[in-house]
């Protein structure tokens, strides 16, 4: 007589959304890192990362065949050695630097800021749940990559949207566009490079992408 329970739930959500004052927050998303500095954690990270179709864009069967037979049995040891050169006492340098960005952004703006990694922890799902529990319904998602690419911004956007549909369907997502041409970003990078070069004696500066 009065419609299905599912329809009723939809109407309730719409009414709540209209009545709810918009609360804004920022979600910073970076690539990710192994959970620990050991071979098992590195292997798990590589497995998740290289299983992403936006990173390795080949037929799934071939992707997994190469990954399971030729990469995961050998690559974790080499990758672990590379991580050992940069790992800190506080943990992953990527997660630490992302936390630093979060804290500086909070200090400068007073905004509520969550961080997440596209692969491994802290997860996007956890961040979205935290935002939901704290009543933030308008979210500015900032993929921390200046450029646009399938393996960075695109996969991040797809995953955030997928998880938001599952755990936070009422969220309004606003994705910040790639900022590689932003004048302030370019000046900040240039300033950092110049200051570093003044402190260190190098013969050449090489840019690699």
Cite the ranges covered by each PLM segment:
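Single conserved hydrophobic/aromatic residue that forms the stacking wall/gate
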Residues: 1-14
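Active-site-proximal alpha-helix that buttresses catalytic centers in soluble enzyme cores
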Residues: 19-209
């Amino acid at each position: 007589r009065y419609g299905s329970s599912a329809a009723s739930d939809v109407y309730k959500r719409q009414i709540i959304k209209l009545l709810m004052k918009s609360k804004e927050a920022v979600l910073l998303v970076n690539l990710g890192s192994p959970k620990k500095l050991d071979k098992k954690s590195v292997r798990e990270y590589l497995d998740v990362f290289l299983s992403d179709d936006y990173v390795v864009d080949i037929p799934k069967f071939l992707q997994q065949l190469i990954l399971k037979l030729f990469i995961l049995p050998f690559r974790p040891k080499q990758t672990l050695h590379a991580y050992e050169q940069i790992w800190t006492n506080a943990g992953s340098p990527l997660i630490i630097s992302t936390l630093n960005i979060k804290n500086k952004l909070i200090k400068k703006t007073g905004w509520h800021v969550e961080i997440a990694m596209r692969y491994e922890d802290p997860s996007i799902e956890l961040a979205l749940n935290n935002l939901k529990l704290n009543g933030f319904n308008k979210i500015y998602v900032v993929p921390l990559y200046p450029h646009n690419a399938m393996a960075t911004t695109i996969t991040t956007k797809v995953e955030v949207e997928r998880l938001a549909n599952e755990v936070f369907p009422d969220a309004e997502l606003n994705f910040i566009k790639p900022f590689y041409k932003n004048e302030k970003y370019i000046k900040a990078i240039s300033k950092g490079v110049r200051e570093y070069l003044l402190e260190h004696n190098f013969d050449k500066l090489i840019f690699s992408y």
